[in-house]
């Protein structure tokens, strides 16, 4: 049985629009060829289901290199958390505990 993904893939324009909102936003900067990114994806889907007041999105760094450079993403996965239009934290690597901690501290 497959689980439907709940983390929506966005482009740079959609990410910028989402960042301007007042909800906590978690963006997963990923690559399709990245093994740790693939293993983290179902965990992020689960977190999205658990935290309905938090917006989860993902951005393919190969398709949106300019956006990845803007946010200084040099390793995948990198998750950046935004609130009220500002970057408030990031986690580099498939560190599920670190991501959960950052969400709980800011939700």
Swiss-Prot record:
Family statement: Belongs to the thioredoxin family.
Site note Contributes to redox potential value, residues: 35-36
SUPFAM superfamilies linked to this entry: Thioredoxin-like
Database matches in CDD domains: TRX_family
Residue pairs linked by disulfide bridges in the UniProt entry: 34-37
Domain Thioredoxin: 2-107
Keyword Disulfide bond: yes
Gene symbol of the encoding locus: TRX
Native organism: Echinococcus granulosus (Hydatid tapeworm)
NCBIfam families, per the entry: thioredoxin
Name of this protein: Thioredoxin
Single annotated GO MF: protein-disulfide reductase activity
Catalytic-site annotation from UniProt: 34, 37
